[in-house]
Amino acid sequence: MTISNLIRSRCSLAAAKSFLENVKSFSSHATFAEHKQLEKIRNIGISAHIDSGKTTLTERILFYTGRIKEMHEVKGKDNVGATMDSMELERQRGITIQSAATYTIWKDHNINIIDTPGHVDFTVEVERALRVLDGAVLVLCSVGGVQSQTLTVNRQMKRYNVPCLAFINKLDRSGANPYRVLGQMRSKLNHNAAFVQLPIGVESNCKGVIDLVKQRALYFEEPYGLKIREDEIPADMRTESAERRQELIEHLSNVDEKIGELFLEEREATVEDIMGAIRRSTLKRAFTPVLVGTALKNKGVQPLLDAVLDYLPHPGEVENVALVEKKDEEPQKVPLNPARDGKDPFVGLAFKLEAGRFGQLTYLRCYQGVLRKGDNIFNTRSGKKIRLARLVRLHSNQMEDVNEVYAGDIFALFGVDCASGDTFVTNPKLELSMESIFVPDPVVSMAIKPTNSKDRDNFAKAIARFTKEDPTFHFEYDADVKETLVSGMGELHLEIYAQRMEREYNCPVTLGKPKVAFRETLIGPCEFDYLHKKQSGGQGQYARVSGILEPLPPHQNTTIEFVDETMGTNVPKQFIPGIEKGFRQMAEKGLLSGHKLSGIKFRLQDGAHHIVDSSELAFMLAAQGAIKSVFENGSWQILEPIMMVEVTAPEEFQGTVIGQLNKRHGIITGTEGAEGWFTVYAEVPLNDMFGYAGELRSSTQGKGEFSMEYSRYSPCMPEVQEKLCHEYQVSQGLVVDKKQKKKN
């Protein structure tokens, strides 16, 4: 039925509107299902410090691009919660825990968006997201500015060479100062950054933004800022906008030759000249364009989407390489073809795992070729063959089936047994692997047990799922103290998993006190020469190993290495894996405090074998004996995790806060102040940070806040080492506890 037919039959206007809505809905669904050409694809992440407004910004993006019909707020104030916060716990806490993936269309471009967590305890989620993205939007709060997690995200973007543009959000907040934030980007992040927009008023006065490139004022009108009205720049801001535009051109001329020539020749740069220079410089990570707005008040979001298309790269502008790995050879880097023509074989990377209602959901990025429903794919790590029954694209926790995916697409598979960082190919002869995703070691452990013993089955299921999903979440059983331990990136990380066990598996758990993941290491090199010989009737055991156990440099003190330097046949090659196994088993538990060994290198230089009595087991036991001899003869020390701590509070509490950090053996690395508030940066041992949140709140009348993130491992203080050694000896029954003795 056409509109004219509806009118002729005197149907109600409501019926005509309903018909149009259905047509629009159908056409928009068809649009989302389309496959775009390479130049019309953007894979972006939205990263920032906690509470900078990332999820709210994503919600607005989805609304303006027609992906959702209505907007909801974070923290579920309207009992719905933001679309991208699909987990019940996320809606309650108002923080994003898992990166939700979605795709949308803006001006005939397909934008894949990963909304990432801002809390430091979920850093591995950000790492995974950035690994598979081509560009990112760095969201900063116009009050908080550059904060500790912003520095972390910035380092991660640098590691994966991700170009970014900055969005200074929350202009409507009291104390908003985007100019100070720009200064911090230049001083703290070392970004060559400049405004491409200026705010027209801040706080309650926030009316719109000025586009410095096109020299126009933009006002966001109608409900939800859907209509953008262009106008002349307000008279009282013309001088400032001219100065800021000149500043933008100067910053670009330092890194872009074309605009640099125009600047030196004092010729006027056109809009196209400036936009071209911004794009070229941003792709090289030589410049960061800075946009402004307030997502909550619906101002500045559409121009940000335009900037994503104008200044961030499409998959063809980013070089992605795979490694060709062959035995006993150095891996060779091979560039991947991003063309969406399917001429090259498929290569994809699994960057996230999630256990859903229908089995394991695996998020992948297609780097090369095309993948169709019904194809067979191979996991290059395990060699497993998988037949694809279903391909989906994701919109937060909702799925849309597709028949094929091309290079540059982000998609998901069901029921694929794999690990995060695995590479998939359709041609099993391709011995390729994408560079693996960097995963930090956990720094905090807690004892954990189900509150009710009848829940053990559910507890085991939850642990199995969470350890597979999150490589920074570890689980082990400590036989010495007969406790099950979970380890992670912080207290909040472990608390959230405990709450998820209760909520998702109906298994309430009890967490013990947090324990720091100390490590033991050698102070200097120590030689070993150990003979393992056993004869008790029948085949005996004979193996001799000699070499050096030495410390690794400080930047490698969280790893252990094994190197075979033997020449000739004194130690047959088939026994080398046994020696390495023996070394790695002994590295699980040190002599001083029972913690793992790290920062050491086992150099096997010589040995001896017997033609009958030698075996892999004999050499494994010889390696263990060699480590025991180094325990006795070498000099050992305990390492502890050092955290980067950032504390913000009103100026009148500065002395108190610094005093508290000094008391906790902190080293102050910097301070800064602005508008009655100060921020202090310090490096503090994690062992001294427990209970700090309560102390800070009570000493600053609830106004102080802090964040911390792992920095490195460093030797602990002598008194701490002495205490740890004594506690371990007491637990092993090697010495009697004096306090216990007095009680008895």
Curated annotation (Swiss-Prot):
Localization (cell): Mitochondrion
Principal cellular location given in the protein's record: mitochondrion
GO molecular function, a single term: translation elongation factor activity
Residues given in the record as GTP binding sites: 48-55, 115-119, 169-172
One Gene Ontology biological process: mitochondrial translational elongation
Top-rank taxon: Eukaryota
InterPro entries assigned to the protein according to its UniProt record, in alphabetical order: EFG_II, EFG_III, EFG_III/V, EFG_IV, EFG_V, EFG_V-like, EFTu-like_2, G_TR_CS
Pathway annotation: Protein biosynthesis; polypeptide chain elongation
Alphabetic keyword roster: Elongation factor, GTP-binding, Mitochondrion, Nucleotide-binding, Protein biosynthesis, Transit peptide
HAMAP family (UniProt xref): EF_G_EF_2_B
Entry similarity comment: Belongs to the TRAFAC class translation factor GTPase superfamily. Classic translation factor GTPase family. EF-G/EF-2 subfamily.
UniProt function note: Mitochondrial GTPase that catalyzes the GTP-dependent ribosomal translocation step during translation elongation. During this step, the ribosome changes from the pre-translocational (PRE) to the post-translocational (POST) state as the newly formed A-site-bound peptidyl-tRNA and P-site-bound deacylated tRNA move to the P and E sites, respectively. Catalyzes the coordinated movement of the two tRNA molecules, the mRNA and conformational changes in the ribosome.
Protein name as it appears in the record: Elongation factor G, mitochondrial
Species whose genome carries this gene: Anopheles gambiae
